[in-house]
Amino acid sequence: MKITSISVQQKNKERYNIFIDEKYNFSVDEEVLARFQLMKGKVLTEAEIEEIKQADMVRKGLNKAINFLSHRVRSEKEIRDYLKKQEMEPFAIDEILKKLADMDYINDVEFAELYTKTQIKTTLKGPRTIERELVEKGLTREIISQVIEEYSDENQLENATKQAMKIMKRNNKSAKKMLQQKITTDLIQKGYSSEVAKAASLEATNELDMADEADILQKQIEKTMRKNKRYKPSVAKQKTITSLMQKGFSYDTIQSYLTENEISFEEEE
């Protein structure tokens, strides 16, 4: 089988169409064209053509992978998954990854270090969440253990406290005890240990005093009483107390406040 002509592709000047015996047969990257010294008049066997096609697949996949990496650093697993989606053959994926490693495009340790530092500085995620994400990205336990040590106890408490302040602002209608429980639970879900979560919760709510809680209780009582005014006094009172207890206020605190402020439900008849 003889190459009868070679033409440059109109949409990609770095790729060439190869015609064998006057018919289009395949296309190759410029690097593959030069490596196999493809030129008009050259005779190729079927085995040689298959070898050229495989080499071109690797070259094409390598170009795609480098472009994929141009947006941000990736783990080896992320690149492998990307190449699979590009319908690359397994042999090509393995060869591409080897070439990328040789070119220093892949380094899972550096990737894990950079990813961890970025998450610590920009997302306020807890260490367990970051560990889980690194596992999903294909990092080994050894690498994960190594890089997560960079997340110091001091940084964890600082970030957890910042998260706690945000949670507190979104839940400023609850009693202090309930608020602390809410903050602790949310922080654990965000990847912090229970010890760090509790410490951050206490730190964030430290400046809430009795006056603040009394003010919150007053507003909640007024709101709940308006909501329950359609009920008879005894039912309205019970519903109000139940609602307030669900927000973390103790029964004794509610009763004391109602008594001290002479709040009566009789007026709602």
Swiss-Prot record:
Annotated compartments: Cytoplasm
Keywords (A to Z) from UniProt: Cytoplasm
Fetch the InterPro entries from UniProt.
RecX_HTH_1st (IPR053926), RecX_HTH_2nd (IPR053924), RecX_HTH_3rd (IPR053925), Regulatory_RecX (IPR003783), WH-like_DNA-bd_sf (IPR036388)
Matching entries from Pfam families are given as: RecX_HTH1, RecX_HTH2, RecX_HTH3
Indicate whether Transmembrane helix appears among the record's keywords: no
Q: Does the keyword Cytoplasm apply?
A: yes
A GO term from the CC aspect:
cytoplasm
The Gene Ontology biological process terms listed for this entry are: regulation of DNA repair
Which superkingdom heads the taxonomic lineage of this protein's source? Bacteria
The family classification in the record reads:
Belongs to the RecX family.
Q: What does this protein do?
A: Modulates RecA activity.
State what protein this is by name.
Answer: Regulatory protein RecX
**Gene symbol?**
recX
